Amino acid sequence: MKAQLFTLLAAAAVGTGTVQARGEYAEIARLRSMNETVRGIRSMADGEHYTILEGNNIVRYGYATAGQGEQMLPKPTANLVVTDYAFSPDERQILIASGARPIYRHSYTTDYFLASGNSLMPVLREAEAPRDASFSPDGKLIAYSDRNDLYVYDTAGKRTRRITDDGAWNSVIN
């Protein structure tokens, strides 16, 4: 009788462990199948805020606070369609890509705007087909490509300097 009781208890314990292990495995498999990143959220340098593109505006939220976010752009502009954006290293300026025109696969040219304080102004206007613009580490310059040549735009002096002159379509890509 004791042997049968012991066998019954041992079988129940082993069975419970198997069911529990299956449940844990199912939970692990479920978690692994989830996305590994959260698209659209960009963490800010202070570690306390993040931004999201909502409609045609960039909105800043706090991780620890709920509620309405702070709009980062001065005011909506009719000809501005925000397709991408990047903050300067000090996060005082925002480089905005607007109106992407596809080239091939994931490549595109676009118009660029610079938001700083309460102003929003077009930049890189003399460029024929600007693309891949980004801030320099000090935030004073914007580097970009135009017709496969590299350029640097000075945000303070509003002047462009050509860096390369050997770019050619489908031949030399700088």
Give residue spans per PLM region:
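Bacterial N-terminal signal peptides that target proteins for export
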Residues: 1-6
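Beta-propeller folds
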Residues: 17-174
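Hydrophobic h-region of N-terminal signal peptides that target proteins for export
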Residues: 8-18
